[in-house]
From Swiss-Prot:
Subunit description: Forms a cylinder of 14 subunits composed of two heptameric rings stacked back-to-back. Interacts with the co-chaperonin GroES.
Catalysis: reaction(s): ATP + H2O + a folded polypeptide = ADP + phosphate + an unfolded polypeptide
Lineage, highest ranks first: Bacteria, Bacillati, Bacillota, Bacilli, Lactobacillales
GO CC terms in record: cytoplasm
This protein's encoding gene: groEL
Region (Disordered): 523-542
SUPFAM superfamilies hit by this protein: GroEL apical domain-like (SSF52029), GroEL equatorial domain-like (SSF48592), GroEL-intermediate domain like (SSF54849)
Function description: Together with its co-chaperonin GroES, plays an essential role in assisting protein folding. The GroEL-GroES system forms a nano-cage that allows encapsulation of the non-native substrate proteins and provides a physical environment optimized to promote and accelerate protein folding.
Species annotation: Streptococcus uberis (strain ATCC BAA-854 / 0140J)
N-terminal signal peptide: none
UniProt keyword annotations, A-Z: ATP-binding, Chaperone, Cytoplasm, Isomerase, Nucleotide-binding
Amino-acid positions noted as binding ATP in the UniProt annotation, renumbered to this chain: T29, L30, G31, P32, D86, G87, T88, T89, T90, G413, N476, A477, A478, D492
Tagged with keyword tRNA-binding: no
Descriptive protein name: Chaperonin GroEL
Bias (Low complexity) ranges: 526-542
Length: 542
């Protein structure tokens, strides 16, 4: 295919047009007074959302060069979302600001490489200062505040803080759709381990790329399944019950995996295969934990058991299993409460006698998975459109809250980024590196400007007053008041803020140092039917 190539200023200008289109679409959602964006869906009702990464992923531009710029900013939002779970709109606003200011200087003759070094040094200084001013998060009230700010709902903040209190900060918290109109919290027994499906063709929800199994049987073995004949008698038994099957094995490969996938695609039966968690002796112990939780038996040669002789009686059972590409969650295993209690007691006694810190950590993990639960926030709403929007907000809030517990909090509303300006300005740089530093200094103000603008205030006036206010004081865009941000509960996780800045600086620097862009040439349109011919006349040509 022929390629279209642009160089230097033309290349950068085309990409920046794409950056601006995406950023201008996303940044209207920033802050407590941010607006919504309506996304058209091929099927069903439109999605109304203020979630930055969801909007960014939907944008595809007709011009190939502009689309590349937009996709780079979308990557900033996605990366920030993957690392911190929130802050995607802030990252987009920062990227646009750095690119805009940087392009002015590059066009004026500054060296892009020098500017890039200055941006990197300024970003590092800002991140160090953010970590230095961060305050740890502890207590139910502080956790509720973080979640409430992210979700814009005090009620959601209460649900998330209660969920984290009941299953622990690292516990499993999932978000589901409620059948009613009210949002509620439910804690159920469950276990999670870090192994995902072996084939993406096993998913049941193509949008979320997850496999949901309702009331499944669970085959647990430490053997490798390569020959489908080994488990064929068992599969035939399961097929008669019309229930789904989860296979937890050392591995599923050879002819077995494609055979299972083919039957899944054909709709013969619903099956998902995952690798067993852990390694060596720890794997055997974890498989035994799963077997006790689900009321099954581990098919292992250690017990003289063979896969080809296994019956349905050896399978575990659960109310629900959810598998994504990275993890598996087993909810409401069918194991007896007495057997689970005995297993918990055994692990506790091992904890008391172990001297290895590593072993202690792994035993505590197993204990939490076996004795802990899964908190489920059931989201209710009047319409499907409102339900989807609320689910996205709660997911963001949960991620932001975990990030806050992990690295601490700073003043919210973009205030923390303005607070670190003095530290960045103190960097002694010269030439184009100093220009790069100044670009970051201007960009650090941009989130506050945008939050103020979205709330109907003049951003420059707010910035000037903020710079002359005591540290910690900021602008509450929801009320128009100047308050102590942390005391008022307007806070951001430092992980979210620093990730947004780091990712924005990284991609913006790449755009500024771009010297050529290569894109596919648009394919010519198919020739139209010759004019003047009556389509009805074509009948005689057949």
């Amino acid at each position: 295919m022929a390629k279209d190539i642009k160089f230097s200023a033309d290349a950068r200008a085309a990409m920046v047009r794409g950056v601006d289109i995406l950023a201008d679409t996303v940044k209207v959602t920033l802050g407590p007074k941010g607006r919504n964006v309506v996304l058209e869906k091929a099927f069903g009702s439109p999605l109304i959302t203020n979630d930055g990464v969801t909007i960014a992923k939907e944008i595809e531009l007709e011009d190939h060069f502009e689309n590349m710029g937009a996709k780079l900013v979308s990557e900033v939002a996605s990366k920030t979302n993957d690392i911190a779970g929130d802050g995607t709109t802030t990252a987009t606003v920062l990227t646009q600001a750095i690119v805009r200011e940087g392009l002015k200087n590059v066009t004026a003759g500054a060296n892009p490489i020098g500017i890039r070094r200055g941006i990197e040094k300024a970003t590092s200084a800002a991140v160090e200062e953010l970590k230095a001013i961060a305050q740890p998060v502890s207590g139910k009230e502080a956790i509720a505040q973080v979640a409430a700010v992210s979700s814009r709902s005090e009620k959601v903040g209460e649900y998330i803080s209660e969920a984290m209190e009941r299953v622990g900060n690292d516990g499993v918290i999932t978000i589901e759709e409620s059948r009613g109109m009210e949002t509620e919290l439910e804690v159920v027994e469950g276990m999670q381990f870090d192994r995902g499906y072996l084939s993406q063709y096993m998913v049941t929800d193509n949008e979320k790329m997850v496999a949901d199994l309702e009331n499944p049987f669970i085959l647990i073995t430490d053997k490798k399944v390569s020959n489908i004949q080994e488990i064929l008698p068992l599969l035939e038994e399961v097929l008669k019950t019309s229930r789904p099957l989860l296979i937890i094995a050392d591995d599923v490969d050879g002819e077995a995996l494609p055979t299972l996938v083919l039957n899944k695609i054909r709709g013969t039966f619903n099956v998902v295969a995952v690798k067993a968690p852990g390694f060596g002796d720890r794997r055997k112990a974890m498989l035994e934990d799963i077997a006790i939780l689900t009321g099954g038996t581990v098919i292992t040669e250690d017990l003289g058991l063979d896969l080809k002789d296994a019956t349905i009686a050896a399978l575990g059972q659960a109310a629900k299993v959810t598998v994504d590409k990275d993890s598996t969650v087993i909810v409401e295993g069918a194991g007896s409460a007495e057997a689970i209690a005995n297993r918990v007691g055994l692990i506790k006694s091992q904890l008391e006698t172990t001297t290895s810190e590593f072993d202690r950590e792994k035993l505590q993990e197993r204990l939490a998975k076996l004795a802990g639960g899964v908190a489920v926030i059931k989201v209710g709403a009047a319409t499907e459109t409102e339900l989807k929007e609320m689910k996205l907000r709660i997911e963001d809030a949960l991620n932001a809250t975990r990030a806050a517990v992990e690295e601490g909090i700073v003043s919210g509303g973009g205030t923390a980024l303005v607070t670190v300006i003095d530290k960045v300005a103190a960097l002694e740089l010269t030439g184009d590196e100093a220009t790069g530093r100044n670009i970051v200094l201007r960009a650090l103000e941009e989130p506050v400007r945008q939050i103020a603008y979205n709330a109907g205030y003049e951003g420059s006036v707010v910035i000037d007053k903020l710079k002359n206010s005591p540290v910690g004081t900021g602008f509450n865009a929801a009320t128009g008041d100047w308050v102590d941000m942390i005391e008022t509960g307007i806070i951001d996780p430092v992980k979210v803020t620093r990730s947004a800045l780091q990712n924005a600086a990284s991609v913006a620097s790449l755009i500024l140092t771009t010297e050529a862009v290569v894109a596919n040439k648009p394919e010519p349109a198919a020739p139209a039917m010759p004019g003047g011919m009556d389509p009805s006349m074509m009948g005689g040509m057949m």
